[in-house]
Amino acid sequence: MALTNEEILNAVAEKTVLELVELISAFEEKFNVSAAAVAVAAPAGGAAAAEEQSEFNVELTSFGANKVAVIKAVREATGLGLKEAKDLVEGAPQVLKEGVSKEEGEELKKKLEEAGATVTLK
């Protein structure tokens, strides 16, 4: 019996963020692909000045010496449970939040760095 697209979407919607990360990794391995965004060439000719990036991804690069404080900060920022936050922190580098505004990204970066983490905005 083949699954319908609707059944697949419902199954994915029920998964946690950590389970989705594992699923994406499994897809990458099985199909030998990368989930990284494809770079698009800028239009040639009289292109206007490059627009400032409006959406950022907050990436936890390293948790540093104070892992417990970083886990607490991650839980606070993402709403994840203790185990999910711990797994995310220990799996660094990991993207914590995607598509956030520059202000929200900078605020989250500041909180995590105060807890001892190394964070980058991309």
Swiss-Prot record:
Any coiled-coil regions, as ranges: none
InterPro entries listed in its UniProt record: Ribosomal_bL12, Ribosomal_bL12_C, Ribosomal_bL12_C/ClpS-like, Ribosomal_bL12_oligo, Ribosomal_bL12_oligo_N_sf
GO cellular component: cytosolic large ribosomal subunit
Molecular functions per Gene Ontology: mRNA binding; structural constituent of ribosome
Single GO biological process annotation from the record: translation
Domain of life of the native organism: Bacteria
Assigned keywords, A-Z: Ribonucleoprotein, Ribosomal protein
UniProt-listed Gene3D superfamilies: 3.30.1390.10, Single helix bin (1.20.5.710)
Sequence similarity: Belongs to the bacterial ribosomal protein bL12 family.
Function: Forms part of the ribosomal stalk which helps the ribosome interact with GTP-bound translation factors. Is thus essential for accurate translation.
Quaternary structure and interacting proteins, as annotated: Homodimer. Part of the ribosomal stalk of the 50S ribosomal subunit. Forms a multimeric L10(L12)X complex, where L10 forms an elongated spine to which 2 to 4 L12 dimers bind in a sequential fashion. Binds GTP-bound translation factors.
Name used for this protein in its record: Large ribosomal subunit protein bL12
Organism: Acinetobacter baumannii (strain AB0057)
